[in-house]
């Protein structure tokens, strides 16, 4: 398993010459478009939400983790969904709060080598995995009525 992961990472960072890099860009448009469509179709059905941003390194039991959980609960209690980056820390806490109130708990996860998987408090039908940061950022902005 570790060997496969190492090979995947090596392949991602292979040296390519300039024409190879540029010619592959034109085909990426289809991957980018697919991520936009997936995001639009999923998020347009959820209703009003607030995007919650914060550190992935904040641990459960700390002051800021507890505050983010409380914020998620309060948002969900007034009918607002919570959108986070889907990871641990403040993101997890915001999703946990929404989950406790049975509100919409959305995760916009990014697929990166060495990064976390999504947290367990995201509604599985509201988890979207992205490969492109800029598409993910659009979703944070387009479907939020507020930002924390």
Task: Describe every region a protein language model picked out.
Residues 1-2:
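Charged, compositionally biased N-terminal leader segments and the immediate start
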Residues 5-6, 15-108, 116-117:
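Glycine-rich beta-alpha loop segments
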Residues 89-147:
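Acidic/glycine-enriched connector segments
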